[in-house]
């Protein structure tokens, strides 16, 4: 099995391509989801998409317990939380999620940040920044 490729340098997004809207995907253990949801709500995140997923990372192949039983650690149940933000700084989302999830052990989770090119609120036709605002 080949070793993971180590990232040596972050490639900055050219300013012309940065829409100021970002999707943050957070992969988290089931047991940590409620703490993450509460922490995100406390900083003003009002909407999120939550999906139950299966995945593995560095803990692959190690013994894991799920609901008290030893399970095959090839794929473990996780939760993927996705938020799209424009008003709340991405770094605040990352910092909040990291503090809510950190245990110092393998399996604490991963955070992925993507630039969002376009958002359309279907009901109103609002686009981009306006589509992300919670006003009626």
Residue ranges of model-derived segments:
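Positively charged, small/polar-rich N-terminal and surface patches that mediate targeting and assembly
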Residues: 1-136
């Amino acid at each position: 099995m080949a070793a993971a490729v180590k990232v040596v340098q972050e490639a900055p997004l050219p300013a012309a391509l940065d829409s100021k809207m970002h999707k943050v995907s957070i992969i988290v253990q089931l047991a940590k989801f409620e703490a993450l949801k509460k922490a995100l709500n406390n900083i003003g995140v009002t909407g999120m998409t939550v999906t139950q997923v299966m995945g593995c990372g560095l803990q692959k192949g190690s013994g894991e317990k799920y609901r008290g039983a030893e399970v095959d650690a090839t794929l473990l149940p996780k939760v993927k939380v996705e938020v799209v933000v424009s008003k709340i700084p991405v770094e605040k989302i990352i910092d909040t999620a990291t503090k809510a999830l950190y245990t110092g052990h393998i399996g604490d989770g991963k955070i992925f940040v993507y630039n969002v090119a376009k958002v359309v609120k279907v009901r109103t036709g609002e686009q981009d920044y306006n589509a992300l605002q919670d006003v009626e």
